[in-house]
Design a protein with these regions (language model features):
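Adenine nucleotide-associated cytosolic modules
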Residues: 1-3, 18-20, 24-33, 40-57, ...
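N-terminal intrinsically disordered, low-complexity tails enriched in polar/charged
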Residues: 1-9, 85
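Non-catalytic regulatory/accessory regions that flank a structured catalytic core
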Residues: 82-92
Length: 355
């Protein structure tokens, strides 16, 4: 069993140099809870090495005293110095009124608590969260695909979300458009979305534009964002977005759903050797060839799955993580629970980027 030391006694001994206080908490815990200036972070050092270098007793402290007690018990017999566990860990230290300083961070205490699980990911951390805070995304459509995308972008701390939609909330939307509620029927979707997202995360900027994208409006919407997420439901809008993304060199995340299936793809028009959306669909289908959701129906959860996958790709791209869907389309069959990727080749005859 680990030898215990009270936080007050550990503090007294550390102040006079009788004890070396080692903080086992990770960066996420420190950012969320606070810094103990007289404690050293263990960081990446092996504990046996630290003990071998010590000339005085060592006390280990974690968030609640559990992890540190286990390490003390495991290392006590082989330790060349006296090894103690700070009883109750950081929480007992703080409860005793001992000194705790605010961490040096660009995030407020509330934000550090909110994004704790991001800070715990080495691939994201504070630096990645700053990237998200500084990023801006255009979300076209606050419907079935746009609902999960908007919610998860806001929850992730995306700094600025621009939502474009000219529709109003209808009761038939609520089977799949989880951004809206019964009380919002008749409201503009952008207003309903803005209220919901501000309630979810008041620290981000939500910009709304109650309009239908056209040739006279699309460039202004695309030019001042980092990434475009297409949650529209028609080919003319997708072609407009693709052309604008080509002009302004913005990545485009496309998605579509029908009945029990969906697909999504990431295009970076303008990049050497990369296809655009129109390489995939050179011409719009004729009238009645591709029914919309109102005609064919859609299982309510499908837009949630596809829209969430869109958001995953968006966050990966903004953070520079993993392998993206760039130049590919992911096809999801909900009934068979199958996922397959199709690589899209640049089309030299493409009416948009072929020249």
């Amino acid at each position: 069993m680990a030898e215990q030391i009270a936080p007050e006694e550990a503090h007294r001994q550390a102040l006079v140099g009788e004890l070396r206080l080692i903080d086992l908490r990770d960066q996420a815990e420190v950012l969320a809870s606070g810094v103990i200036e007289i404690a050293e972070p263990l960081a990446d050092r092996p504990l046996p090495q630290l003990l071998a270098e010590s000339r005085q007793a060592v006390a280990l402290m974690c968030q609640r005293g559990v992890r540190s007690a286990r390490l003390c018990a495991e290392a006590a017999d082989s330790s060349p110095v006296r090894l103690l566990n700070v009883a109750g860990g950081f929480e007992a230290w703080r409860a005793a009124g001992l000194p705790v300083n605010e961490p040096r961070s660009p995030f407020s205490a509330r934000e550090r608590e909110r994004y704790l699980r991001h800070f715990a990911l080495p691939e994201v951390g504070e630096a990645g969260q700053l990237k998200l805070r500084r990023a801006s995304v255009l979300l076209v459509g606050a419907g079935g695909l746009g609902s999960p995308a908007a919610l998860y972008l806001a929850a992730a701390g995306l700094g600025r979300i621009v939502i474009v939609d000219d529709d109003r909330v209808e009761r038939s939307n609520l089977q799949r458009q989880v951004l809206h509620a019964e009380a919002g029927i008749g409201q503009l979707k952008v207003d309903s979305a803005s209220a919901r997202l501000r309630a979810l995360n008041p620290d981000i900027e939500i910009e709304t534009r109650a309009l239908r994208l056209g040739r006279d409006t699309v460039d202004a919407c695309v030019a001042d964002v980092d990434l475009v997420i297409d949650g529209s439901d028609n080919f003319p809008t997708r072609y407009l977005l693709n052309a604008a993304c080509l002009r302004h060199a913005r990545p485009l995340l496309y998605a579509a759903v029908e009945r029990f299936s969906g697909q999504l793809g990431l295009f970076a028009p303008g990049r050497s050797g990369q296809p655009c959306y129109r390489c995939l669909f050179p011409d719009a289908p004729g009238p009645g060839e591709v029914p919309n959701c109102a005609e064919a129906g859609v299982l309510g959860v499908l837009p949630g799955i596809i829209g969430t996958l869109q958001t995953l790709e968006a966050l990966k791209m903004l953070l520079g993580l993993g392998d993206s869907l760039l130049g590919q389309v992911l096809v999801v069959d909900g009934l068979q629970m199958s996922f397959r990727k199709i690589r899209v080749s640049p089309d030299p005859e493409c009416p948009e980027c072929g020249s």
